[in-house]
């Protein structure tokens, strides 16, 4: 067992705080419309330029083990916010740093860390309730465009295209982002479908950065039953390998020998392949497999239809221009099915919706109809160089997540102002003791941090901006960092999704509370550099 190094109390917290500061200071420069870029060196290819907080956080690894622990816990804040809301990672990091700093001071002054954490939790619960109460529902296309523009770092073109995409496929519709071969941004709505099933093995992943499988011009095998024996699949697999195209298998399940062999084939580079479970259950699964078959121009291999896997040829496989399989979803874009067949299937489902008396069945039929008829909006992002395309694609991804979050939970005034406006809810909050009251005050001071940082990144004095905002009690009154003007942020189009603000605060407080209550840290002791020199061989005098 490796030798461990242990740090206690203030020594542990100081080392950890240094790591938190290094991480947060690298991320915080990206906050707001006038935030700066961060350049990340990659082991291969050109450096990456980004303004995405979580992308910066994921790249930071510190040499000192104890500092690195602090940095990695702060990275967890950004990652969790990104997973929940898809945006707001920089805000969450700035909030977490502020809470940790204030908390460390309070602990050093002799406050009880557990009571501080309880006070922090009470304050966050109260603020989240108030944020939800004050959130305004998104109803207009213009508001969706404004949210997307803010999240895309003030790029109105990205905001316009995202709003247009949502208008075409609906707020719940599927929108994918790809790299374009031109220098412009393009929007196209293609026949496509998404269902809630992910890859059966992470070894199928082809894009490690996005953690997903991407198959271009793929064949699709649709099977009604479980696949556990590989023998029956060999003829069809050989045909696909000869064609040189990738293959997506959709079946009730793929397990045992069949899954293991597919993974081995993928790893050895012989076959670009992925396997997913078929969506739905029972009769609904059969119907959804048939929907996919019609969309892709394939045939479902089913005993009821008299088709067997052993005798199947490549002609019964479906085709799609692009397939993306993530951990929990599969998206099929531009299937090879004929428009007439798809139209006939849509008409059939509409007739079933009219005939059914069950609300549950009607809801499920409407879901199928939306998947089949809604299509997939593809936003193609272009640029002059590969670096520019990747940077712009990051911003489009952020904007897409932000707009979805806005539709889900509503919008609030942007620029960090919403948190400042709800701080009054902390005034009458009951606590069990004075240390919990200090925890509440820590949150009261920390929620100024995003406004201060946005102001500093825009070249203004954070304290002056916060002071002017406090002079007015109007909920929507704030400072537009892009123009340097004060006014109604809703009218100016400076808005944040409520879900993003909420998730940023909750995740920041959660991890910061754990850091504040840390009393000891254990890490592996670094090995000493250099090997002992060998003694000179006999007869070798130097």
UniProtKB/Swiss-Prot annotation:
Compartments where located: Cytoplasm
Primary residence: cytoplasm
Enzyme class: isomerase
Keywords, ordered alphabetically: ATP-binding, Chaperone, Cytoplasm, Isomerase, Nucleotide-binding
Bias-annotated ranges (Pro residues): 533-542
E.C. designation(s): 5.6.1.7
Presence of keyword Isomerase: yes
A molecular function GO annotation: ATP-dependent protein folding chaperone
GO biological process assignments: protein refolding
Stated family: Belongs to the chaperonin (HSP60) family.
Subunit composition and interactions: Forms a cylinder of 14 subunits composed of two heptameric rings stacked back-to-back. Interacts with the co-chaperonin GroES.
NCBIfam families in alphabetical order: GroEL, PRK00013.1, PRK12849.1, PRK12850.1, PRK12851.1
Protein name: Chaperonin GroEL 2
Phylogenetic placement of the source organism: Bacteria, Pseudomonadati, Pseudomonadota, Alphaproteobacteria, Hyphomicrobiales
């Amino acid at each position: 067992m490796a030798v461990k190094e242990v740090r206690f109390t203030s020594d542990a917290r100081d080392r950890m705080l240094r790591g938190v500061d290094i991480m947060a200071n690298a991320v915080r420069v990206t906050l707001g419309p006038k935030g700066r870029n961060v350049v990340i060196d990659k082991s291969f290819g050109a450096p990456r330029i980004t303004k995405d907080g979580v992308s910066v956080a994921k790249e930071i690894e510190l040499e000192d083990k104890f500092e690195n622990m602090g940095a990695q816990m702060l990275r967890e804040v950004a990652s969790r916010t990104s997973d929940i809301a898809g945006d707001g990672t920089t805000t969450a990091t700035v909030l977490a740093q502020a809470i940790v700093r204030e908390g460390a001071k309070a602990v050093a002054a002799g406050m009880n860390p557990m009571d501080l954490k309880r006070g922090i939790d009470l304050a966050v619960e109260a603020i989240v309730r108030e944020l939800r109460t004050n959130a305004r529902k998104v109803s207009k296309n213009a508001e969706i465009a404004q949210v997307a523009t803010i999240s895309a770092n003030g790029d109105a073109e990205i905001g316009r295209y995202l709003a247009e995409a949502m208008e075409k496929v609906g707020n719940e519709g599927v929108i994918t982002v790809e790299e374009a071969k031109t220098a412009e941004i393009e929007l196209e709505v293609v026949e496509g479908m998404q269902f809630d099933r992910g890859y059966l093995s992470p070894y199928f992943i082809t894009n490690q950065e996005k953690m997903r499988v991407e198959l271009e011009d793929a064949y699709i095998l649709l099977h009604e039953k479980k696949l556990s024996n590989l023998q029956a699949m060999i003829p069809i697999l050989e045909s696909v390998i000869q064609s040189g195209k990738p293959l997506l298998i959709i079946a009730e399940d793929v397990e045992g020998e069949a899954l293991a062999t597919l993974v081995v084939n993928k790893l050895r580079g012989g076959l670009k392949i992925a396997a997913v479970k078929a969506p739905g259950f029972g009769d609904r699964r059969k119907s959804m497999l048939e929907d996919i078959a019609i969309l892709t121009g394939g045939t479902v291999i089913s005993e009821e239809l008299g088709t067997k896997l052993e005798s199947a040829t490549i002609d019964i496989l479906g085709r799609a221009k692009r397939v993306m399989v993530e951990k929990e979803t599969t998206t099929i874009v531009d299937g090879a099915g004929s428009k007439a067949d798809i139209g006939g299937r849509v008409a059939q489902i509409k007739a079933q919706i009219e005939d059914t008396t069950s609300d549950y069945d009607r809801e499920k039929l409407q879901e199928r109809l939306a998947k089949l008829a809604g299509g997939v909006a593809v936003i193609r992002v272009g640029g002059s160089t590969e670096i520019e395309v990747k940077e712009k694609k990051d911003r489009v991804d952020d904007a897409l997540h932000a707009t979805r979050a806005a539709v889900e939970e509503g919008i609030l005034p942007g620029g960090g102002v919403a948190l400042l406006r709800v701080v009054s809810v902390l005034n009458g909050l009951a606590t069990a003791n004075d240390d919990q009251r200090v925890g509440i005050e820590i949150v009261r001071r920390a929620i100024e941090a995003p406004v201060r940082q946005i102001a500093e990144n825009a070249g203004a004095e954070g304290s002056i901006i916060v002071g002017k905002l406090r002079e007015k009690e109007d909920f929507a009154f704030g400072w537009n960092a892009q123009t340097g003007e004060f006014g109604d942020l809703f009218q100016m189009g400076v808005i944040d999704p409520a879900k993003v603000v909420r998730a940023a605060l909750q995740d920041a407080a959660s991890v910061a509370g754990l850091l504040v209550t840390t009393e000891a840290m254990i890490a592996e002791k670094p090995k000493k550099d250099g090997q002992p020199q060998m003694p000179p061989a006999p007869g070798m005098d130097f």
